[in-house]
Amino acid sequence: MSGQDKASQRVLCAMSGGVDSSVTAALLKDAGYQVIGAMMRFWPDDKRVDTFDTCCSPDAAYEARRVAEQVGVPFYLLDYREQFQHHIVGPFLSEYAQGRTPNPCVNCNTKVKFDELVKKAKMLGCRYVATGHYVKRVEREDGSVEFHRGDDPRKDQTYFLWGTPREALPFILFPVGELEKPRVREIAAEKGLLTARKPESQNICFVPGKVQDFVAEHLPQRQGLIREIRTGEVVGEHLGTQFYTLGQKKGLGLYQTHRVRHVVHLDPETNTVWVGDYEDCLWTGLKAEGANYLLDLAELPREVEVQVRYRTKPVRATVLHADEHGFELQFEEPQFAVAPGQSAVLYAGTRLLGGGLIADHARNLPVVPADQAAQPVPVSG
């Protein structure tokens, strides 16, 4: 696209007050686009502002506005408090109450950022939405757009974007997707941006400390039993299944601690935490629901790579079944503690194909109700 063409293209740049979105705005401005900076307000009036992490706080909004002034672009603070509470905070707590382990950042990108922001961009007459995600946008000769892993493998964020509506792909830009993080900071320093040395946010933005503390504040305790998955034996007590996640081995509240046990299964209906050995946490496959695909379903390859948690390497898998609602796949090698509620994200090489929410599994060891667990359960395979 020529400079003259870019000058006629308006871009809504999502700004968080961090270095990545700051450099994104600066690069777009340098490239000749008409840039509008915007930050989404998530913090409610009835909450202390320090309960929000640096990427979503009033201080971050102030810094984003100052960066917009440095870059020379207009800046708007957009009110999305209601949507954030409805689509993100509420479901986050609901998932924990149902024994699942949610990833709110995936939900936020899907239902707030790349849904609401694209709508707002169209209202403002913008051709594109841009963010500071480390994702590569690849445009093919036929005009179709693909999302690929960012060039910095340590910062790649495609895992969080599997839910992006396919029709929105052509309207999203990722200017830092082809850069490594140190270079992004260099650019910020060269331009004198005040966020050049700002540390990265590490927490869930609306959880000020530990997730368990946040969950405890909002969900009531329910005392229950911890049982051994193979025998049904009671080996401890707990204060609620919402305080546990699959694979967990510390802080379980077991009567005896000489043997290492992991959380194998959570059953909120009976208020039971099931524990077992490491091998009991191995999954041979998974079922995912709420699927979204960034290509025609007929083009989804049978052999894929799947990533089941952020910052882990993808593993090879075979797609056994896929439709518009979800998919089922088998791992090439069993995987440890695949957690329902997390995302199963599909790739072909560096290309993001789509994903879904992990709903169920195909472990070697079945979960046995307490009234059927008087005898050890034989392990198949």
From Swiss-Prot:
Marked site positions, Interaction with tRNA: H133, Q342
Catalytic residues as annotated in Swiss-Prot or TrEMBL: C108, C205
Gene Ontology annotations of biological process type: tRNA wobble position uridine thiolation
Matching InterPro entries: MnmA-like, MnmA-like_C, MnmA-like_central, MnmA-like_central_sf, Rossmann-like_a/b/a_fold
Localization of this protein: Cytoplasm
Chief place of localization: cytoplasm
Keywords: ATP-binding, Cytoplasm, Disulfide bond, Nucleotide-binding, RNA-binding, Transferase, tRNA processing, tRNA-binding
Span list, region Interaction with tRNA: 155-157, 309-310
GO cellular component terms attached to this protein's record: cytoplasm
Enzyme Commission no: 2.8.1.13
CDD domains assigned: MnmA_TRMU-like
Enzyme class: transferase
S-S bridge residues: C108-C205
Binding sites annotated in the UniProt record for ATP: A14, M15, S16, G17, G18, V19, D20, S21, M40, G132
Catalytic activities: S-sulfanyl-L-cysteinyl-[protein] + uridine(34) in tRNA + AH2 + ATP = 2-thiouridine(34) in tRNA + L-cysteinyl-[protein] + A + AMP + diphosphate + H(+)
Superkingdom of origin: Bacteria
Entries under Gene3D superfamilies matching the protein: Adenine nucleotide alpha hydrolases-like domains, HUPs, Translation factors
One of the record's GO molecular function terms: tRNA-uridine 2-sulfurtransferase activity
Record family assignment: Belongs to the MnmA/TRMU family.
Name of this chain's protein: tRNA-specific 2-thiouridylase MnmA
The organism of origin for this protein: Deinococcus geothermalis (strain DSM 11300 / CIP 105573 / AG-3a)
Gene, per the UniProt record: mnmA
